Amino acid sequence: MRSITPVVFLALVVACAPAPQGLRAADEGPGPKVSFDVFHTPLPEIPLPNDFATRFDALSPTKRRINASIEVAPTRWERRIRAALDDISGWGTLAPITVSFSEPLDLRELTRRHQAPGDLADDALYVFDVTRGSPGFCQPVLLDLGQGHFPVVADDRTYFPEEPHDALESLLFEQQEEDLNGNGVMDPGEDTDMDGVLDHPNTLDGKTGGPFDVIGFYEHETNTLIARPLEPMREATTYAVVLTKRLVGKDGKPVRSPFPAINHLSQTQALGAVSECLSTQALGLDDVAFTWSFTTQAITQDYIAVRDGFMGMGPLAFLKDKYPPEIATLEEARRSEGRGTNTKIVPGAQFANLGEQLLSFVGGSDVTDGSKELIRGWLRSIDFFAAPTMVSPQFFPRNDSEGKQLPFYEQTMKLDPLRGIAETRDETVPMFMAVPKNRTGPAPVVIFVHGHTGSKLDSIIFMGPMARFGIATIGLDAVSHGVGINDADISLFSGIVETYGITPLANAILKGRAWDQNGDSIPDPGADFFSAYVPHSRDTVKQTAFDVIRLVRVLRSFDGKRTWKHDVNKNGMADDLAGDFDGDGKVDLGGPDVPIYMAGASLGGIMSSLVGGIEPEFDAILPILPGGYLSEIGACTALGQVKNPLVLRLFAPLFLVRDGPANPTLSVMYPSAVKNVEVKLASLPTLPPGSIAVMRNLKTKDWRCARVQKNGHLRLAVPSDEGDRLQLELYDQELPSQEKTGCDPTGVTPVKVVDTLDREVKFLGTTIPAGSKLTAFADGYGLRRGSPEMRRLLALGQIALESSDPANFAPFYDGTRTLTYGDGSTVKTRALLVPMTGDPGVPISTANALMRAAGFLDVRKVDPRYGKSTQQQLIDVGFVEGVERTRRYTDAMGRPVLMDADVLQSVRAGADDGFGAPRLNPPMRLFGPSEKIGGTVGALLPYMDPKGAHSFPIPDPGKSFDLGSLLLNIAGGYLGSGGTRVAVEACAERSNCDWFPPIPP
């Protein structure tokens, strides 16, 4: 098993080898020293990312693999996740760059130098591309060091019950002052969160402040500088981080190298271009205090290999024959009405009334009578519906050789093109399809992906507007997704559809890829899609991308010549043209030259913005509620269906006492699919406020401490594998402080030990009898909020997620970076991104990062409308922060509101959304013609709710301003024009533009 040993071994070899030369000798003297301690526990303390912590692998595309220090992880499941990291070919392209010091830095001097990201003349820190031959050779990476591109203020500040430090603004950084008497010493009782550290606010000056004062570019507790790339770095490329002498401590002295030279001697060759790169900034090696190198991972190789494989090329060429481009089944859609009835489709007219009810099901109470009338008109543009399926190769396993489901941390892709490894299994991908009327040939197609925990049924709101513009819509279920309803709801649903004679279509729609993940007999869509099992989450995203790429191949195969096995014309022969769903002898959609688009919302917005940068066949994409920097989405989202499986797993097992002090009861909280479950375990004696509880993991010999709060409540956790024996100990005296564990109970006798359940417990479908030993019911990291461990783990998570992160693929849209396949095709995709102002689900800051990566937001260029860059303008007006409770702005009633940056209501005189929000003047309007690929590209910034919203507005012509109709008509017009027209026009809001295709009677 690999461990920390290779890193230590390299350190010893270099120490004992003949002295090689560094770039130059380091300066002597005082000043904060860079921390570089490979023996530090629990993890080495070195600047990261760093090629010092990689190992050679001849079959890696970069000749490197990460060494993630497997042995130091306390639990089996964390070791397996770290082992998956060891397979990655290099460091992150978006992940933070961190370096710790022996003493605090002068943060005001640092922020003064780094105020303007585009002005690098006097920066203290640089990151250069030092790979000769790279298109970005010697170009500096733009960095955020507190300029506001990555706000730390979370929309939902609550991260589960009984937090010892409540009302923190961030998941990652401390805000509480524990040194109550200001003596600089941890006095008894001051360590209220029992982390073994005297906490101070993570603000610029370390003093208590408001929400805007918390900083994310520096961690006071560890003296760690945290730099965030503003744009994705290039894949499989070596970079140098250069700390200049301008980076100083509080005494004004420059930071120092930990070595006799300004670099580790093993990296001198890799850093050979640093002097040349520094000269571009009028600097030289004499200006350098310390430098190190790192190599980014390859992020495109799997997509290239799989797509080429589908076309019979490259190391995975077998995929073409094993998975030919074909529709596997055409599901029954309606009852037969006599001989010759095509039961594989439902005519649009037969579906119309049901479609209206389904839209009400999807849209809820927002669907008004006016909405229904408008929707009925759109649905009249649909010729027929169908429910095809395809078989798609899945590159990660679900079960072991005996058919038992694998833990999620073992459900990772067995895909390594350079080694010729591609283990696949078959999985049926169900789809829901609508084909427009008035076709003069095969219809263009938009592939629509639903939101997280949704299904292909969500595409119904898109189908009518797309059909009006002559576009067919295919909704597909992403990995692990489908309609998640219980038997009673299924019966109700079936009863409704039976009235319309299309029960078979309803049954086909209900077939999905979701399954019961928590033992309640109800499918749990998406429960494992975004979770703390990060390599698995990465691979669910990648697999969904592969499914979409395969669907594109299927659509392109409808060439008007090939036949398929489906006898839709009922002549008893397999002579129907592939793609002829209605049996009229003509291909209905797709084909070699027909435009193909992609769209989706939330998860679908993430998927369409990802695959839009991967698949060359897309003419245009329309991601709604999209975002990049996936680890940031996970850490900052307010969506419970993501917070529970991801963030709660980081805290779990979360032991709570919530009903003290009279009758305290110990309970535990875990994720339950996309929800959480809390079960009571045992009664406890009265817990005096300020007393201490210790939870021990008897298997790992690890423990954590917590202090009983003033109200008698308690919260504590310990890292655990499922099944580990645990023991709660209660103490009535102060225990010595200890870092990591929080306290040291050695030699002190607890007043009470709880290691047994005093009642029957039901957990995720399992009954545990009273008298059973206290165990961990599931895996959990047992982390604390606002801790360096949490921050480091999320940084590792971003490294694991890079190959599935849309922001990494956005530069491919317009060819700013080139992605070319074996058939010579190159990605050139027109994109219109539609994030929602103040989105708390896919935080608007992550959509902002995606827009920046795509080139739709400029960091360097001054926009004459504002006298600053568009990016800086959005930061300054609070758009990037996107949290109204900070009260940057209030309405006439004094209620907190967000700034409206695009002012879409101004498209029509007299339109009013009624929000009374401040409006940016002039509106931002981040879209326009593309010089590189033609057409129109960019982003819209709709304002749906003054507090922000993670949803799409239902069209309602009865409103003074109908944002829903405007956006759907913009979507239809954009894709219908091949990505050339963005109809921010009054007639689009009223659905009556003279250039709109007429709605059939």
Residue ranges and their predicted role:
Residues 395-420, 428, 440-443, 447-567:
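Cap/lid segment of the alpha/beta-hydrolase catalytic domain
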Residues 532, 536-543, 610, 616, ...:
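C-terminal subdomain of alpha/beta-hydrolase-fold enzymes, centered on the catalytic histidine
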Residues 110-114, 137-140, 238-242, 250-262, ...:
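Short, solvent-exposed loop/turn and secondary-structure capping segments
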Residues 14-15:
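C-terminal motif of bacterial Sec signal peptides marking the signal peptidase cleavage site
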Residues 350-441:
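N-terminal cap/lid segment of alpha/beta-hydrolase-fold proteins
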Residues 573-636:
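Primarily recognizes the serine-hydrolase "nucleophile elbow" in alpha/beta-hydrolase
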Residues 171-204, 501-525, 560-589, 714, ...:
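Acidic, glycine-anchored loop motifs typical of Ca2+
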Residues 18-391:
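Acidic, low-complexity Ser/Thr/Gly/Pro-rich repeat segments typical of extracellular/periplasmic
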